[in-house]
């Protein structure tokens, strides 16, 4: 969360409070969903722009007693429709609920190819 939050702040997509807002959300309800992925996000939409920071790990980490290798840090601005998050969440979950698709995304180390795979599914 720290690494990805820093990237969003560096690029001007979120302010310095973003990381603490995400960590506060994790305290309330961890965002590791099983099948090797997590989708952290703040409780409120506090981003400056709508962005997703993605991190694929070579080795899994423990995240609230679940193994995680693929992280989607969601950054939505306050003007975003709630349905935007719901649609994004549903899309990511539908892809990652399929172990073969999840593994293909985890293994892809080229960002352009990763995006192509993501949108292909």
Question: Where are the predicted features?
Answer:
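Cytosolic covalent-transfer regions centered on His/Cys nucleophiles
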Residues: 1-121
